[in-house]
Amino acid sequence: MNKQLLLKKRPVGLPEEDTWAMVSNEIPEPKEGEVLVQTHYISLDPAMRGWINEGKSYIEPVALDDVMRAGTIGTIIKSNNHPKFKVGDVITGWGGVQQYFTTTGEGHFKVDTSLVPMTKYIGALGMPGMTAYFGILEVGKIKEGDVVLISGAAGAVGSVAGQIAKLKGCRVIGIAGGPDKCAYVVNELGFDACIDYKNENIYSGLKEHCPKGLDVYFDNVGGDILDAALAAFCEGRSCGRRKSFSMFSSG
């Protein structure tokens, strides 16, 4: 059987249990020119919250009673004369939150799991990594010597964005929650410093680590942290942010 997660209603604020329904259906058979894929991993991305809102955005919303959209990586276990993929190929693309799915291959790409672990293709080499790469380079337009602040620094996007900024010769300050995450951000990821928003005052931390102000802020969280970062900007510099999903600043 094929377990699938269906969208049952559009949430207001945070999704709740009745937003979804877990169902079991027969494993589908691939039609002519299709393949059957067994899902190994699903990419859980913040963008998924936006996909279940009503109304068109940069992408059509997930329809009610449809399988929840998600990036996946899996192995082809059956082919019906597919011109490009064969049984045993590992592919990544839009597979949805389900154990098996069929596809024509449109929007899917074969990956080489001998180069890096499979999960990297839905992490640093997938949507989170691409968000970080294009956000920090194309939107933030960082340059050597910039002071860059990254919120959500221990997360999938923030961790990659910060490392790219370090490679470009920037001074990089992270914001994360808790001493363990901050230690990881500095000691493992190579950030210059990290502000623990759970135990430190953000404004004081920014004054300590960015006394001359910020050049670029990569915002992953919004809210009060965004407010503090905006107050620390050098005049005329850049703030690039990901979308707010379920929470908003009160001022």
Task: Give the ranges of each region predicted by the language model.
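NAD(P)H dinucleotide-binding glycine-rich loop of Rossmann-like/cofactor-binding domains
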Residues: 68-75, 80, 84-152
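Glycine-rich phosphate-binding loop and adjacent beta-alpha segment
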Residues: 186, 224-251
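Short amphipathic alpha-helix with an adjacent loop that forms part of the alpha/beta core around
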Residues: 201-212
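Short glycine/proline-centered loop/turn elements that form peptide/ligand docking sites
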Residues: 79-84, 174-184, 198, 202, ...
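N-terminal Rossmann-like NAD(P) cofactor-binding module of classical short-chain dehydrogenase/reductase
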Residues: 92, 149, 195, 217-218
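A generic alpha-to-beta junction signature in SAM-dependent methyltransferases
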Residues: 142, 210, 233-234
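Glycine-rich beta-strand-centered segment in the early N-terminal region that forms part
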Residues: 26-44, 52-97
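Mid-domain Rossmann-like dinucleotide-binding core that forms the NAD(H)/NADP(H) cofactor-binding site
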Residues: 122-200
